[in-house]
Amino acid sequence: FGFLPIYRRPAS
């Protein structure tokens, strides 16, 4: 995941 501005985790 990495499409949410509040869910920009490095381990997508």
Curated annotation (Swiss-Prot):
**Where is it mainly found?**
secreted
One GO term under biological process is: mast cell degranulation
Q: Where in the cell is it found?
A: Secreted
Secreted recorded as keyword: yes
Where are the Serine amide residues found in this chain? S12
Give GO cellular component annotations, separated by semicolons.
extracellular region
- Give the keywords, sorted: Amidation, Amphibian defense peptide, Mast cell degranulation, Secreted
Organs and tissues of expression: Expressed by the skin glands.
Q: Does the keyword Secreted apply?
A: yes
Q: What does this protein do?
A: Mast cell degranulating peptide.
Quote the protein name from its UniProt record. Granuliberin-R
